[in-house]
Structures are given as structure tokens and as C-alpha cells.
Swiss-Prot record:
Origin species: Homo sapiens
Acetylation keyword on record: yes
The entry's keywords: Acetylation, Cytoplasm, Nucleus, Repeat, Transcription, Transcription regulation, WD repeat, Wnt signaling pathway
The protein's name: Superkiller complex protein 8
Keyword Mitochondrion applies: no
Pfam families: WD40 (PF00400)
WD repeats: 14-57, 62-101, 104-143, 146-187, 188-227, 230-269, 272-305
PANTHER family with a match to the protein in the record: SUPERKILLER COMPLEX PROTEIN 8 (PTHR44090:SF1), WD REPEAT-CONTAINING PROTEIN 61 (PTHR44090)
Classification via InterPro entries: G-protein_beta_WD-40_rep (IPR020472), SKI8 (IPR051510), WD40/YVTN_repeat-like_dom_sf (IPR015943), WD40_repeat_CS (IPR019775), WD40_repeat_dom_sf (IPR036322), WD40_rpt (IPR001680)
PROSITE patterns found in the cross-reference section: WD_REPEATS_1 (PS00678), WD_REPEATS_2 (PS50082), WD_REPEATS_REGION (PS50294)
Length: 305
């Protein structure tokens, strides 16, 4: 166990173009950890994290255009990717094979997320709709309509009750999944919402915007609980730590920041990337952070827990 922050590993030239998305999954059966990256080079890559290094396991071909979003199932060894080619692909992480390709339609599936039970995949669209696909069926099961603009970001609450979406005009919508009803519309940002993340206890929603601010909302009451500044430019990604007390953010200012939820302060900043940092995630126990960016690198950091 480490008691300080530091960079642990750097994978240079991980892709041939900018890396825009990353996911970190734990295979409890094998006690192994998997990192999945999606890049504008049209590839999805699957890496094994072991002995404090990343080893490339699969390079997954199939997308015709850049990969903008990846996620890993919470229950099965499956990854999902969405691309500018308007297709969602499901991949078997045990053999590197494509399970299915879903045509998401002409209004690109920009961002995607597995539901907590991994039975569904939610994707945000250009026309303000969240489309929900069945993982098993590969078909669109239903849609949630924000009546808003292009959706850049979506997140499920870990308890499975809520789905939040963030749009290009800065509007955030929170839906009740059981009823499909729109519960709250939050107007805290005036610029695109690049990312949002629920706390592990599903009580808080953290949002990241091009306005350079991070906002924390109380989900139940839709109250603004905090506004955090510190990044010098667009905030591109946020991810909660499993311990419920910290979250991480990344920015086009080339930095990765770790924040304390209770004190609303930045407790550490990593300046290891050479360009915009598009994706950050914690591992399963919160002891590591992965980040990816336009510099085509994957960085793994140590976190005190």
C-alpha cells in the first residue's frame, strides 16, 4: 500500500493517434485487471495490468472511424466501444473476438455506459436522446428524451436508479430509470458537459465542463453542493474513487487532479502528459488511476488508500 501519489507506469505510443477514452475492469475470477483504450486510430486495445506494468493483450479491429467511448461490463468479461462510424461494438475480453456490432443509427452514438447490472448499454445521441440497447439482444429497447441538444456524456448511478446526461449546451438531465421520467434538469454550466460521474453511494453527481469548472450536485434534491476550480482550461473527464471520498479529473490543460469530496479541495496534481488528457478512471480498489490523452500515452498513477 502506498501513502503518496506518484506516476507508476507510462505506456508511450500506446496508439497511433489521440486516445479519447479508457476503462478499467477487474476480473474477480482470474484476479486480474484489464485496461481498455479507444483511439482516433480506429482501434480498441485491451491491456492486462500486472506486475506494475501494462501488457497489450488484444488490438481489436472493426471500427471504420475513431473510437470515442469505451466501457467494461460490471458482471461479464465484455467491453463495449462506440465510434464516429455510428456503430457500437461488443468485444469478448477473454478471446479478443467481436461479439456483435450494433448500428446506432445516423446520429452517432457518442458516449456509452453499461448499466450497473450490465444488461443494458446507454448511449447519448446528437439529437438529445439517450438510447438504451439490450446487451443480449443488441437492439434498441427504449429511449429517454431530454428534448435538448447533442449529448456528450452519460452515467448510471451505481444503485441503478438514475441515469444522468450532459449536453453540449451545458444542461444536465437526471432520469429515473424505473419510470423513464425526467427528474431534474440542472443548469449549472453554460458550456459543454464533457463528463459526469456518480459517487459510489449514488448520492452525489460530479460534472465536468468546458467552462473549466467541476460541480458537485446532491442527486436527490438537485442542489448544487459545490463548485471547484483549479483547471486552467476545459475539464474533459471526471471519475469517482470507489472509497466515496475522492474523485479524479482530467483537462485540456494537460493535468490530472485528485480532489477530496469532503473538503472540496484538490489534493494532488499530476503534470505528466504532453497534451490534452481525455480520459481518467480509478481501478477497483481506488489505489491506482489510469489516464489517456492526445499524446497517445497511457499513464498509471499510485494513490494513497
Amino acid at each position: 500500500m502506498t501513502n503518496q501519489y506518484g506516476i507508476l507506469f507510462k505506456q508511450e505510443q500506446a496508439h497511433d493517434d489521440a486516445i479519447w477514452s479508457v476503462a478499467w475492469g477487474t476480473n474477480k475470477k482470474e484476479n486480474s485487471e484489464t485496461v481498455v483504450t479507444g483511439s482516433l486510430d480506429d482501434l480498441v486495445k485491451v491491456w492486462k495490468w500486472r506486475d506494475e506494468r501494462l501488457d497489450l493483450q488484444w488490438s481489436l479491429e472493426g471500427h471504420q472511424l475513431g473510437v470515442v467511448s469505451v466501457d467494461i461490463s460490471h458482471t461479464l468479461p465484455i467491453a463495449a466501444s462506440s465510434s464516429l462510424d455510428a456503430h457500437i461494438r461488443l468485444w469478448d475480453l477473454e478471446n479478443g473476438k467481436q461479439i456483435k456490432s450494433i448500428d446506432a443509427g445516423p446520429v452517432d452514438a457518442w458516449t456509452l455506459a453499461f448499466s450497473p447490472d450490465s444488461q443494458y448499454l446507454a448511449t447519448g445521441t446528437h439529437v438529445g436522446k439517450v438510447n438504451i440497447f439490450g446487451v443480449e439482444s443488441g437492439k434498441k429497447e427504449y429511449s429517454l428524451d431530454t428534448r435538448g441538444k447533442f449529448i456528450l456524456s452519460i452515467a448510471y448511478s451505481p444503485d441503478g436508479k438514475y441515469l444522468a446526461s450532459g449536453a453540449i449546451d451545458g444542461i444536465i438531465n437526471i432520469f429515473d430509470i424505473a419510470t423513464g421520467k425526467l427528474l431534474h434538469t440542472l443548469e449549472g454550466h453554460a458550456m459543454p458537459i464533457r463528463s459526469l460521474t456518480f459517487s459510489p453511494d449514488s448520492q452525489l453527481l460530479v460534472t465536468a465542463s468546458d467552462d473549466g469548472y467541476i460541480k458537485i450536485y446532491d442527486v436527490q434534491h438537485a442542489n448544487l453542493a459545490g463548485t471547484l476550480s483549479g483547471h486552467a482550461s476545459w475539464v474533459l473527464n471526471v471519475a469517482f474513487c470507489p472509497d466515496d471520498t475522492h474523485f479524479v479529473s482530467s483537462s485540456s490543460d494537460k493535468s490530472v487532479k485528485v480532489w477530496d469530496v469532503g473538503t472540496r479541495t484538490c489534493v494532488h496534481t499530476f503534470f505528466d502528459h504532453q497534451d490534452q488528457v481525455w480520459g481518467v478512471k480509478y481501478n477497483g480498489n481506488g489505489s491506482k488511476i489510469v489516464s489517456v490523452g492526445d499524446d497517445q500515452e497511457i499513464h498509471i498513477y499510485d494513490c494513497p488508500i
